[in-house]
Amino acid sequence: MPRWTREQIRSARMAPLPPLLSQRGLQTIALPAGNLELTGYKGLIVKDSYWRWPNQNKAGNTIDFFVQVLGLSFHQAMRQIIGSS
């Protein structure tokens, strides 16, 4: 498995979620204040590189989303977010 640098991990944590969700075919509904609700995940709110899902008592950054919501491993998440370069 690849070793990720601190900078790559920091960059992945701060990667904007909306374009990554679109790439995966996930749809969102616009809400006030720049928030988006992820369709199919009732109550899951996304804004920039942060998300919160009060119904599930979960929240986090972009990496956390890929691991906790989509069920990927850390390495799979990193590959999805920044690629395998």
Question: Model features per residue range: what roles?
Answer:
Residues 1-85:
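N-terminal structured subdomain of primase-like DNA metabolism proteins
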